[in-house]
């Protein structure tokens, strides 16, 4: 598994992943490609995707208000669960938040 920063180029794969996860509540405006691109521009260092078998199998999006960090959409492909992917994504966010001076998430 490889964890990398999410970019706008990952949007279609991430959106497909979100749709594959039961109970994933999506908002037409905020979770549109344009909405996610704006979020990534504001939070370029705190959103990540997990790759395995050359495809996106996990995602985590997080942001900060300058004092606290917030974790938003976190999802793992149902066929790849129970492999530590979500834990690795959360660890990546926690490290990224620490690097930008955010200690409360």
Regions found by a protein language model. Name each.
Residues 1-16:
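A short beta-loop-alpha structural element at the N-terminal edge
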Residues 25-35:
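A short, aromatic/hydrophobic, helix- or strand-capping loop or linear motif
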Residues 37-49, 70:
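A short helix-loop-beta-strand connector motif used in the catalytic cores of GNAT acetyltransferases and
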Residues 49, 55-63, 70-75:
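Conserved beta-strand in the GNAT
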Residues 76, 82-95:
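Conserved acetyl-CoA-binding loop-helix of GNAT-fold acetyltransferases
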Residues 97-105:
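Conserved GNAT acetyl-CoA-binding A-motif
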